[in-house]
Amino acid sequence: TETLYVFGAGTTPDILTRYYLHQKGLSYSLNYSFTTPGEISQGLLAGQIQTAVLAEPFLSVILRKDSTLSIKTSLNNPDSTSPGFAQTAIVYAPSLNDKRTLLDSLLNESCQFAVSQPQKAIDILESRNIFAPGTLTPESIERCRINYLSTGEAKESILDFLRLIEQYEPKAIGGKLPDNGFISGEQ
């Protein structure tokens, strides 16, 4: 059995990896001995690791450093039957509820900007020291599959993802699905 290195047992990358392997009927021995994406990156570049799960921007960095490495599949939405999952949520204080429409609009515009003008987005992120120069590429932005959805639009995807977490790592959500009040203020 081939070994697949994954960082962070019980984290999103681990859960999505186990889900993907199960869906595809693949058998890998999962190894969690490298605890950060940086350690996995170093292991891949040093030839200590042959197959690993790695997120952006680490993926882009190692692909630039070693052209013999390649992507086997994407866990974001590996095929047309996979639903994809909401993986980031923007949470704000109740005092900002009256600004919800404005916030949704700004977030949507920001996501559209990153997708339509990735190099400009990268330049801004680097100029503000959010990412080190050379870490991101337009391809890394594309692989992130950035897409803004309002709470109402994302609700089913969020619930699907929570059900997936419950199936593979229930303690990550406190052992049970949240109640109906978890996703509030839909638009």
Where are these regions (language model features)?
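Bilobed "Venus flytrap"/periplasmic-binding protein-like clamshell domains
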Residues: 1-61, 119
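Surface-exposed patches in mature extracellular/periplasmic domains of secreted proteins
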Residues: 32, 121-125, 173-177
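Residue-level detector of short coil/turn "hinge" positions at structural boundaries
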Residues: 28, 132-133, 172-173
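Pocket-lining segment of extracytoplasmic ligand-binding domains
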Residues: 38-125
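Conserved C-terminal helix/tail region of periplasmic/extracytoplasmic solute-binding proteins
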Residues: 159, 163-187
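Short glycine-enriched loops at secondary-structure junctions
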Residues: 8-11, 75-78, 129
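Secondary-structure end/capping motifs
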Residues: 95-168
